[in-house]
Every structure is written in structure tokens, then in C-alpha cells.
């Protein structure tokens, strides 16, 4: 998805989940029904930032391309251009990987 297809507002980000492993280290294949949804993703697009008390826009700490960790129940699942993505607030992000 190109970042121009959808632009989140304010302090929201669009995240693509990173696919979880299909096999365990021991070689056991994990069926889709038993897999947990990954809590790791890549930021696809970011909003302009939230406004502080004085009305000034505070830019986000994350940017498109960052790999992040987020909470299990974070965000809202959406389908944009046929791709399953998440929209969440920056506060739902626990940290940036790397």
C-alpha cells in the first residue's frame, strides 16, 4: 500500500502486522486456527500529530517504515486496498524495534 492511499489523522498510525512463524523451532507446523495474531508490525503511514494544550501540533515519535511492538488488543482492524491493516493511536505503541 502506498502511503498516499490513506492518511491517518492526528496521532494515529497505520500498521501492517508482521506475519508469525508457520513452524516451531522443533519443526511442528502451526495451523492458522492455533496461531496468535502477531503483536509486531511495520508502520505504513502516520498522522500529522496531536495538538497540545496551546493548540500546537506535536509530531509523532514514529515514522513510516519503523518496526514496532504493540499491545494484543491495540488498534482497529481495517481493510485498505484489499490489505488487512491496523489503525491505532501512537500511545498504543509499546516501542520501536531496532
UniProtKB/Swiss-Prot annotation:
Segments traversing the membrane: none
Task: Using the UniProt record, give the first listed, main subcellular location.
Answer: cytoplasm
Keyword field contains Chaperone: yes
Q: Which GO terms describe its biological process?
A: chaperone cofactor-dependent protein refolding
Swiss-Prot/TrEMBL keywords: Chaperone, Cytoplasm, Plasmid, Stress response
List the GO cellular component terms. Answer: cytoplasm
| UniProt similarity note | Belongs to the GroES chaperonin family.
Q: What does this protein do?
A: Together with the chaperonin GroEL, plays an essential role in assisting protein folding. The GroEL-GroES system forms a nano-cage that allows encapsulation of the non-native substrate proteins and provides a physical environment optimized to promote and accelerate protein folding. GroES binds to the apical surface of the GroEL ring, thereby capping the opening of the GroEL channel.
For this entry, the protein name equals: Co-chaperonin GroES 4
Q: Which gene encodes it?
A: groES4
